[in-house]
Amino acid sequence: MRASWVESRRGQANVSQMHFARQGVVTEEMAYVAKRENLPESLVMEEVARGRMIIPANINHTGLEPMAIGIASKCKVNANIGASPNASDAAEEVNKLKLAVKYGADTVMDLSTGGVNLDEVRTAIIDASPVPIGTVPVYQALESVHGSIEKLDEDDFLHIIEKHCQQGVDYQTIHAGLLIEHLPKVKGRLTGIVSRGGGILAQWMLYHHRQNPLFTRFDDICEIFKRYDCTFSLGDSLRPGCQHDASDAAQLAELKTLGELTRRAWAHDVQVMVEGPGHVPLDQIEFNVKKQMEECSEAPFYVLGPLVTDIAPGYDHITSAIGAAMAGWHGTAMLCYVTPKEHLGLPNAEDVREGLIAYKIAAHAADIARHRPGARDRDDELSRARYNFDWNKQFELSLDPERAKEYHDETLPADIYKQAEFCSMCGPKHCPMQTKITDEDLEGLEKVLETKSGAADLAGVKMEKES
């Protein structure tokens, strides 16, 4: 849908949404986002210019339906997919993409690390995707030298970064905030470095005894990004991997650097969001969100979870959705989903579904808590359908209509029960929603309630009704 929009921009030195917004131009993408978010176009333009909102929209991803990530927009959800050397293939990843979009993913990250032709998989995903696609280029940089850190040089990183831009990647996780001076701070951790990209760069610095090349070449990366309107997702290489390590010196030192890099990217009119933890106790989530806003000048915050306990492998879509809802309430702009397979293995299609639904619940709960206009409309509509025993309407309004209908039909599968005024929980005689209090029922109660002895009189009225 965007081919005609971007044609006139091709060849310009800077085609980023931030660049146009700062010139007072409302792009077609901004206008589209304004309609989706029910926001004034002028507000979208101002928020993009300020850096509080991003519209990840590479000019080479022409099939994209533009969306916004930021404090002024609805809380968004990202789904991770990707092939590994030990599991999955290209066809399965495209199927995961389609499933993720079906269940409401606002963006999708291709985290493929090997085992397939990475360029082929990525291109297939971008061509099939109406939502923004993100990547982590250091994975392919390492794969391009067959996993040999000692053979990886600075130009390899930049070559892969530009290749991803050329292919239409909308945002890239760039682990530029991890500095060589941060590495000693990791020693006291329980789980060290848990970011794959961060681990690669830590190994590179330890082997070469040189500063992080993504930091030293950051301005070069900005020059690449602004030619394609690729957005930075500044990676948190030192995110905590357990409750013990949350909010420690290593994490906060990197966060400070991420804030500095945010402002450097903005100086190039390049869009930025900042990634965050991770594993964080409930009582530290508000601090983490507010600290990021302070250090990073309110650039959109994008968190993985966070998980609020470490003892539930197999259920980490739940442990993390609890933290995600709270993070969203406090102002996080996008939540990266976690599946039941987290810490255990590569997720399959059903895991993608489970993780996404858990996170759509968390994001929606955050929007309600933040009193976003219209956020509760669907809840109220479903509640009316529930009160009126309109089963099909309830299924239709559910985040996962198939699952809702499946669970209802396990015990009452016949079509006649779609008109029944009960479910199998209460049965036909005990459902409290069958009690419909009407004006006729209330006749005479007003006067009783006005008297001093109203409570006693009312008890009598109730007894008479019951008899």
From Swiss-Prot:
GO terms for molecular function: 4 iron, 4 sulfur cluster binding; carbon-carbon lyase activity; zinc ion binding. [4Fe-4S] cluster binds at residues 423, 426, 431. Its EC number is 4.1.99.17. Its cofactor is [4Fe-4S] cluster. Substrate binds at residues 80, 109, 139, 175, 195-197, 236-239, 275, 302. Binds 1 [4Fe-4S] cluster per subunit. The cluster is coordinated with 3 cysteines and an exchangeable S-adenosyl-L-methionine. It catalyses: 5-amino-1-(5-phospho-beta-D-ribosyl)imidazole + S-adenosyl-L-methionine = 4-amino-2-methyl-5-(phosphooxymethyl)pyrimidine + CO + 5'-deoxyadenosine + formate + L-methionine + 3 H(+). GO terms for cellular component: cytosol. It comes from the Bacteria. Pathway: Cofactor biosynthesis; thiamine diphosphate biosynthesis. Keywords: 4Fe-4S, Iron, Iron-sulfur, Lyase, Metal-binding, S-adenosyl-L-methionine, Thiamine biosynthesis, Zinc. One of its GO terms (biological process) is thiamine diphosphate biosynthetic process. Zn(2+) binds at residues 279, 343. Catalyzes the synthesis of the hydroxymethylpyrimidine phosphate (HMP-P) moiety of thiamine from aminoimidazole ribotide (AIR) in a radical S-adenosyl-L-methionine (SAM)-dependent reaction. Belongs to the ThiC family. This is Phosphomethylpyrimidine synthase. The gene is thiC.
